[in-house]
Design a protein with these regions (language model features):
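Glycine-centered low-complexity coil/loop motifs and glycine-rich tracts
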Residues: 210, 321-326, 347-355, 415
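Right-handed parallel beta-helix
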Residues: 112-113, 150-159, 198-208, 221-234, ...
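Extracellular "leader-to-stem" segments immediately downstream of a signal peptide or signal-anchor
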Residues: 2-5, 11-12, 17-89, 94-107, ...
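Generic long, charged, amphipathic alpha-helical segments
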Residues: 371-374, 384-403
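Short, T/G/N/S-enriched strand-turn elements that build extracellular solenoid repeat scaffolds
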Residues: 77-81, 96-105, 119, 204, ...
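Short glycine/acidic-rich loop motifs that flank beta-strands on beta-rich extracellular proteins
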Residues: 85, 98-99, 119-121, 163-167, ...
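Short beta-alpha connecting loops at secondary-structure transitions
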Residues: 136, 290-291, 316, 342-346, ...
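Active-site-proximal loop/turn and secondary-structure-junction residues that shape catalytic pockets
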Residues: 94, 219-221, 271-273, 322-324, ...
Length: 454
């Protein structure tokens, strides 16, 4: 009898109601209704001791003397790879380098106060065939490059600093006499470029002052960006096109616990541009695609979660485009926003067939200029001889559980000759806006529930 009483008491203490079934845990689902796999819940930190033999960079000629040590740093990466792998450890101090290229089995760890500082000399970043603005082309390499690697990590409490001021200044000086100057005319290195990789984790460090895009992930899968501080200034000198995170032909991406404040988009979903950029999923009879080599490598993006982040100034918290073709299952949730231009920005290119579908933005507080912006994006418009304008689509777009102060609530331009909007859901929105206009007729099948705009 005593044993029975003890068991019952234990069950009650543990919160299990005797005679009742335990409540089922709700599954975490993608916007299309499929289940999110457990991989997205595993946010365990990288352990330095688990990365293999440690190579302190100062023991191999990379010293804090203000000189550029690209050769020494690359030689160390090559040595570690030849020796079977390990981790480069950057101690406290500032260490200057140009572009370096990591190899299989070689990791990077930056201790608190340890900074890898990029050279401000363009010749320290070799030109190579790479991926920029939705095209395959020649461009500068990044400061940190990883291509074709499995299991690559960057971690620690230090910083990678792009030392971008000189590059920014040159860009704006050139713009002053040529207002059509582009990022390809005034090339600048990215900070981190991850391409053709899988099982990558970048965590804990500061990524700052990039000359161009800060973190570019291309043709990669299973990448986690955790607890990063990503920054470039919007004043007194604007850091042009310093997107925090560019996701370009990727699958299974987690961005969690990051702070982002940059002079462009915080998270931009890319993938390609041009009249046949969707050739990876659409057959074009009678079209010689070999005439468009810049579109080789275009692709879609699937299964992306951005959560538990804090945003300072940026152009877009989540931007689809401008070089984007197909995006499926994108979630932005549990974020705080201060001074963003746009919470959700759908850039619709009239020269590119685009499909944005199953996008959810939820559980958000903050302020910005536009709650949602949907509009044509005509920069570098080029049909490349195609006679008809390709149609684009945005479908199953959900925004819910949001409290937001903004200038414009519904900044949506209707262009049925270029794109079609369908199956939007606005639910549980508490909005304070200067411009409150709301055109549900712009969207086919628009569900509106508990939306308060004041």
């Amino acid at each position: 009898m005593k044993k029975t009483i003890f068991i019952l008491a234990t069950l009650l203490i543990c919160g299990v109601a005797v005679g009742k079934k335990a409540p089922k845990q709700t599954k975490d689902l993608w916007p299309d209704g499929t289940e999110i796999e457990a991989w997205f819940k595993d946010t365990a930190s990288v352990k330095l001791e688990g990365l293999g033999r440690q190579y302190r960079v100062t023991d191999y000629g990379v010293v804090n003397d203000g000189r550029i040590h690209t050769k020494e740093l690359q030689a160390l990466i090559d040595k570690v790879a030849q020796d079977g792998g390990g981790v480069l450890v950057v101690p406290e101090g500032v260490y200057m380098t140009g572009a370096v290229f990591f190899k299989q089995g070689v990791h990077l760890y930056l201790k608190a106060g340890g900074v890898l500082m990029g050279s401000n000399d363009p010749s320290d970043y070799p030109l190579l065939q790479t991926r920029i603005e939705g095209e395959t082309c020649k461009y500068y390499s990044a400061l940190i490059n990883a291509d074709g690697l499995d299991g690559f990590t960057i971690s620690g409490k230090g910083a990678i600093d792009g030392n971008g001021y000189t590059f920014w200044k040159h860009f704006w000086e050139r713009r002053a006499w040529n207002n059509k100057c582009t990022n390809k005319d005034e090339q600048r290195p990215r900070l981190v470029f991850i391409s053709n990789c899988k099982n990558v984790q970048i965590e804990g460090i500061n990524l700052q002052n990039s000359p161009f895009w800060t973190t570019h992930i291309y043709n990669s899968e299973r990448v986690k960006l955790l607890n990063l501080h990503i920054y470039s200034p919007a004043k007194p000198v604007k850091a042009p096109s310093t997107d925090a995170i560019d996701l370009d032909v990727v699958k299974n991406i987690l961005v969690k616990g990051c702070y982002m404040s940059v002079n462009d988009d915080a998270v931009a979903i890319k993938g390609g541009k041009g009249p046949y950029a969707d050739a990876f999923r659409t057959k074009y009879e009678g079209v010689d695609l070999s005439k468009f080599p810049e579109m080789q490598g275009d692709g879609g993006n699937e299964n992306i979660i951005i959560e538990d982040c804090v945003y300072g100034f940026c152009h877009g918290c989540l931007t689809l485009g401008s070089e984007s073709v197909y995006n499926h299952n994108i979630i932005l949730r549990r974020i705080k926003v201060d001074e963003a231009n746009n919470l959700l920005w759908l850039k619709m290119r009239p020269d590119t067939p685009q499909q944005y579908e199953y996008v959810t933005v939820e559980d958000i507080e903050g302020n910005g200029k536009n709650f949602i912006l949907v509009a044509p994006w005509t920069q570098f418009y080029d049909l490349k001889g195609r006679e008809t304008t390709p149609m684009s689509y945005s479908d199953h777009i959900t925004m819910r559980n949001i409290r937001f102060d903004c200038n414009v609530f519904f900044n949506v331009i209707q262009r049925e000759d270029q794109y079609h909007l369908s199956n939007f859901t606005f639910e549980n929105l508490d909005i304070t806006a200067q411009k409150k206009e709301f055109h549900t007729e712009y969207v086919e099948n628009f569900s509106v529930k508990n939306v308060n705009v004041k």
